[in-house]
Regions:
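Bacterial N-terminal signal peptides that target proteins for export
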Residues: 1-11
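Bacterial N-terminal signal peptides
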Residues: 9-20
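Glycan-recognition and catalytic cores of secretory/periplasmic carbohydrate-active enzymes
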Residues: 24-469
Length: 469
């Protein structure tokens, strides 16, 4: 059935028939026996909201905080074993530091009962970003430093826009939570540094790898005798999907707190680049590009597809232009394609990656992919649930997968990687690339959206009852 569906989906995913074809794929014979799908009612929404709230506390907030706070060296400590014991340090990485600052700020904003606990943690994160990670001599944030704030051979002294983006993200969120002028000034300084040094005024977007002084590093001719995998996966002299979707994310966060015309212009540019250059029919994304935006062949990342659907829709809301047809259409195509090609019919969950129309190449399940998938599926249900139950049913199966296989029932927290049999393939709970960001954001977003859906459902029911009197 999957092969036949794929041939048909090539023609259908970009049209209105995508939902009906997806429904055909979810025939009775394909349904996992352990799932009993619940109808989208207020009671159902509130039940799932309660469950996601419980996981947010048990498997994210209670295990990460305050043990991640480094009171000796500043910032946040990243390395933890399965049972949450500290492991040898990887240093202080800009991505991890920005993400943990953002999480603490968002908890303080969205959970008033926890504000007294998390506001000081957000302030702690900003202090590290401002006092240590920010380059006092040349501006911009270091890609990473050792625990004592010194430049290392592994991180080098370079600046990478992926890290710049998350440091900006954390500083902007911290200002929203704390109203500390220092956090706003840091976010503004970073944006101005990005504009002066990294923005590509000719082709749009940003140069991604820069020297400490802020000069873009150009691509080097490949030497077959010395193949090199770039640190972090970002090759110098090229542009990437991954960096630019997170620049869209961080500039969205910045524009929420600073309604500056230059920030709005850049946010509009980032949304157009992600939607119109990086995303392509039938709902996939190119991963790498030359500086003038010519795509470089690579695989399709299902997790980035569903995450980008959410980030584009978030950006249009921040810009005050919700329901833009081009953005909505592309966001839906990304999720539909991931469901069609990257979805595990048996256990639920999105696979790691594959090709646009071919077989899945990596059938493992990574924590951030599953959490972003949960968030995107409920968002699609909110927008298109009246047309089909596909998204809400997939949301329920996704949630069942996360509860059953991704969460650790003994020591709590989320396993980083699960194999095709549902058994944890990796068990460490923290490292520089695994913060509380993807799972924390997804669970907070999903809980809030479920409660909103429950309220809307009740309003519709009351309105319908009043109309029949």
């Amino acid at each position: 059935m999957r092969t036949a569906f794929r041939a048909l989906s090539t023609f259908c995913l970009i049209s209105s028939c995508s939902l009906s074809v997806l429904a055909q794929q979810r025939s009775a014979g394909d349904q996992p026996s352990q799932i009993r799908y619940l109808p989208p009612t207020s009671q159902t929404y509130l039940r799932f909201a309660s469950e996601t709230d419980s996981m947010l506390h048990r498997d994210v907030l209670d295990v990460w905080f305050p043990r991640t706070v480094d009171n000796e060296n500043g910032g946040f400590y990243s390395m933890f074993s399965r049972d949450w014991k500290p492991e040898p340090s990887q240093g202080k990485f800009s991505v991890f530091q920005g993400r943990m600052t953002w999480v603490a700020a968002q908890v303080a904003i969205h959970h008033p009962e926890l504000k007294d606990q998390f506001l000081p943690i957000a302030e702690h994160g900003v202090d590290y970003l401002n006092n240590v990670l920010w380059d006092k001599k040349f501006g911009g944030f270091f890609w990473g430093l050792n625990d004592h704030g010194a430049i290392t051979d592994s991180f080098t002294d370079r600046k990478e826009m992926y890290g710049e983006s998350f440091a900006l993200y954390g500083a902007a969120a911290a200002y929203e939570a704390t109203h500390d002028p220092k956090a706003l000034a840091l976010a503004q300084s970073e944006f101005r540094w990005m504009e002066a040094h990294a923005h590509d005024n000719k082709n749009g977007g940003y140069f991604e790898i820069l020297t400490r002084e802020g000069e873009p590093i150009q691509a080097e001719r490949i030497d077959p005798a010395k193949p090199q995998k770039p640190e972090g996966g970002f090759p110098a002299g090229y542009k990437s999907m991954n960096t630019h979707i997170h620049l869209l994310e961080s500039i969205s966060q910045l524009y929420e707190i600073w309604k500056d015309d230059a920030v709005r212009k850049r946010l509009e540019e980032m949304l157009a680049i992600v939607r119109d250059k990086i995303c392509v029919e039938p709902g996939v994304m190119n991963l790498y590009f030359t500086n003038d935006w010519r795509p470089i062949p690579d695989h399709d990342s299902y997790g980035h597809d569903v995450e980008t659907a959410y980030l584009m829709l978030e950006a249009e809301d921040v810009l005050g232009v919700p329901h833009d047809p081009k953005t909505e259409r592309m966001a839906k195509m990304l999720v539909d394609h991931a469901l069609a090609y990257g979805w595990d019919e048996k256990l639920g969950g999105f696979y790691e990656h594959g090709t646009t129309f071919g077989e899945v190449e990596d059938i493992r399940k990574e924590w951030w992919v599953e959490m972003e998938g949960l968030n995107a599926l409920l968002l699609m249900h909110e927008k298109y649930g009246r047309q089909s139950d596909i998204y809400f049913n997939a949301f329920q199966q996704q949630w069942n997968f996360i509860k059953t296989y991704q969460a650790d029932p003994e020591f709590h927290g989320i396993y980083p990687m699960v194999g095709p049999d549902g058994i944890a393939a990796e068990q460490n709970k923290g490292q520089n690339w695994k913060a509380a960001y993807h799972d924390g954001r997804a669970l907070m977003n999903v809980s809030e959206r479920l409660k909103r859906l429950a309220g809307n459902w009740q309003s519709v029911q009351l309105h319908s009852s009043a109309g029949t009197d």
